[in-house]
Every structure is written in structure tokens, then in C-alpha cells.
């Protein structure tokens, strides 16, 4: 119970937990109406059987002006009917509100999780698999709220109904009520002892199988070409089928375990009630008929609540694993968010100054830059010192594993240095990452393109009505994409599919270049951004970028040496250190490894 309370406090933070308490108060009110309706049975039966009007009957009669017996029966009948009408109406209202409230909070939790994932440090993000994120924000959240939270609320509601009716029976007929309470308590304990472990097991299987099925789906979709070419489609289908069937079978077993009490308890209940009625008849004789009827009425009302209560416990057990995983994710990300002072998820997207009105010249300095991954003792980069003047171009060259991409991630601000600083006009970029990001146009080797139009792909993150069509066309022209786009069915409004499947690899890279230029950046960073281009197209784009403005600082990572032939500075990296720096010709003369690369590339001097 304490654990469930803690989870509810986390799943419904702040004032939302107060609303949850209000929901419980509403459930208690419904229980009182039900008790009032059931309690009204006793005076009706007593009056109908000619019992003397005394005690509480006399008090009620005096309240209504001492009416005759028939009128009193009608009064209690109206109370009974009104009590059940109000109980039904309140139940519907509370149920509708409760379902909406829980569903809304489930959605809010999923959004907050994604917000945390999107704002966490890049290093932490790299450790998470896509499947784990999808399972957390979708499946864990759904199972935790739909099964665990709703299960707890339903359990509380049914428990209150049973408790109120049992209190009424204890007041009116204590011994039979105690016997009934003991009997059903033992039955409940026995059932839960049998079903608890099995419900938890099925919940664990559902969680693990769902994660496996999601992984299998992502692998199958992302690896489509290789899977088809290697003729292993059946294997990937089998992996997905196995996990999906595990999940379906576990869900089926969980549902069966939740329904099992419904059928078994009916039999157990009838046997128990029959025994108690026989006991009351023997010990009290015919005078106990009204009380027997009341007892039967109360028990008939208790049975469905009792069945639903036990089933709700099964739901809670089934959702326990998902709720534990969700709690762990929320706690971990919230702690991370507090440390990094992450903002909450926005209610609506902001409209930022997406296009920089002017290019603000940027000087970049790397001071004693060292970086190690948290799980490694060996630094990837060691004592990097470099000055990149405003409006100049620099290229990072080196073999695989030399640290080029890590250095770019540090300059971008995605990684924080282990020691040293990246300075923007003399100020550490880590002190104002949003401002730094705003000034950068970044083109990775593998450009991310959502299922969108050409216009949306260039004006990344903006709605069509928010983007500048004239600037979109201008950037497409610089990226040598005008003819390609005009050949499409709907021009810049053509849907190009996820990862721009309608375009070639080179065209996707050019689309990435157009996107980076759309923001009118002060710094353009190109990480193998022209690797899929032919020499002629690459040359045209390079010349076009040079003509845009001499104020842009350009940083290039490339293996193809033709890309970096005319940069102002060429930096050769080896084993995480700068071993040579200068013009292309100077580095060629200083460094034998680079000179050998030039010879292998057959580049003219």
C-alpha cells in the first residue's frame, strides 16, 4: 500500500494528487448512497410485515407528521429509489471524469518523458536505444496508468462500497456480519496468495515481450534493404512474431487471471451466504425475516463489488512491472532535469527567431580541450588548442578513430569537455547553448528528414505557414536542388517520405545543406556533408557557400581531400591530438601521413 501511494504521488504530482483524493471522496459519496439505498430495505419490509412503529420508525414518522403505514412505506421507497438513482448518476459522472483525468495525466507523463529525453545530455541520449524510449513513453505509460492506476482507483472504489455496507451490517447484525467478513477475508487472502505471483509474472512478460517486439520492428524497418538482399526476411519476421505472441499470450493469461475470481467467487459466495442464512434462520427463527432479507440484499450488492475488487487487484499486479519501470525512468530523468535545470514541457510550441536577421561574425577558440567518455579511462581528445578566426574555413582531417566527430560534437556543444573550453567570441559556449545553437548551421553525414514536404524539410521544425518560401527556394538553389525539386509533382510541397526516400543519397545531403543555410547561420559545420556528392556538384556548392558571405565561419570534416583543398586552415588529427595545422600545402609538407593520403588520392599540388 505504501509503495502504491508513492507511485501515485509521482504519477500525479502537485495539485493533481489533490484531484485524485477528490476522486476518492467522490467514490466514498457513491458508497454512502448505496448504503442508504440498501438500508431502506429494512424499514420497508418491517412496515410491510406489520411491525410496530417504534424506535427509528417512530422518529421518521414524527418527522413527516405521523403519516399512516402505507405512506411511510412510500417514503422509504422513495428514499431507496432516489439513493440508487443518485448512486448511479454520481457513479457515471465520477467514472467519466476519472477515466478522462487518468488518460490526460498518462498523456502528460508521456510528453514529459519525451521532453526529458529530448533535453538530456547527448551522451546520456546516445546510451538509450530507440526501442527503450518508445516502450517507456508509450507502453510503460499506458500499462502503468491503464492497469496499475485504474486498478488502484477501482480497488479503492469497490473497497469503500464493501466497507460501508459491512459497517451497516455490523451495526444491525454484528455476529452474521463478522462471520461474513471473516469468511470473505479468508477467501480473498487465499485467492490473492494463489494469483498474486502469476499476475506479476504475466506483467513482466508483457513488458519484456513488448520491448522485444518494438526492437524487432525497428530492426526490420531500418534494415529493409540488407534484410531483403541477404534473404533473411523470415528470420526477422520470426523474431517479431515470437515476441508479439509472447506479449499476446501473457496479456491473455493476465486477462484470464483477472476474470477467474468472477466465476470462482460466485460459487464460493453462494455457498457462504447459504450457510450464513441457514445459521441466522436456526438461531433467530421467523422474526429474523426482515434482517435476512436485508442481509441478502446487502450481500447481493457486495458480490459484484467484491468480484471487481479482486479483479482490480489483478490489474494492479499485472501493471506493477510497467509502473516500476515508469517510476524508475521518471525518477532518473527528474533528477537529471533538476541538476541541469531543464524547463518543463511547453504547452504550445514557441515561435523563435528562426532566421538570423544578420550574420554575427564568430571567432571560435579551443583551449586545452580534453574529453573522455564516462565509461572510459583513455581520453578521446587530448589538449586541443586551436583558434578559428571570424569568417575563415577550417577542415579536420584524420584517420578513423582520430577524434574528428567527437571534436565536432564538442564544438557543437552536444558534449561538455572533460577539461578545457570551447569559446565563442571569448565566452564559453556551454554558458549559452541556446544562443550558440541558434548561430549554427549543421549538416551531418546522415541527414535526418521526417516524413514531410521539401519546404518543411528545409525550414526544419516550422509549419508551412511559418516558413519563408522565398528563402526556401534560395537555399535550394545554393544547394543545387532547384531542378530536382521542380521535377517533383508538387514542387516544394511534394511529400518526400521518411528519410526522403524519394531522393538519392546525394540529394538528401544537399537538402541538409539547404536546411543549414536557411537559418542564415554565422557558423556552418559540415560533417562529411558532401561525401555522397559527385565532384562537379560538390565544387558548385562549395563555391556557392563561399560567395554567400565572408562572415561565415565554416568547419568541415571530410575524408575526401578535394573537399578541403582550399580551406584557410587544415588540422590533421591522430589519436585525439593535433599533429599538424596550416594550409593544405603546409600540412602536406609537415606531415608524412597526410602527404601519403594526398599521393593515394592523386591530387595535384
PLM regions with names:
Residues 23-86, 170-175, 182, 285-289:
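Transmembrane helix-loop-helix hairpins at lipid-water interfaces of multipass membrane proteins
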Residues 23-29, 153-205, 275-289:
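Transmembrane helices of ABC transporter permease
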Residues 80-87, 184-186, 262-265, 269, ...:
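Hydrophobic alpha-helical segments in the permease module
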Residues 118-163, 222, 246, 260:
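Juxtamembrane loop-to-helix connectors within ABC transporter transmembrane domains
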Residues 228-232, 256, 301-334, 338-342:
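Cytosolic ends of transmembrane helices, especially the final helix of ABC transmembrane type-1 domains
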Residues 412:
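Helix-to-loop junction immediately C-terminal to a conserved catalytic motif
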Residues 423, 430, 437, 455-498, ...:
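ABC ATPase nucleotide-binding domain helical subdomain, centered on the C-loop/LSGGQ "ABC signature"
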Residues 441, 446, 457, 475-478, ...:
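ABC-family ATPase nucleotide-binding domain "signature/switch" substructure
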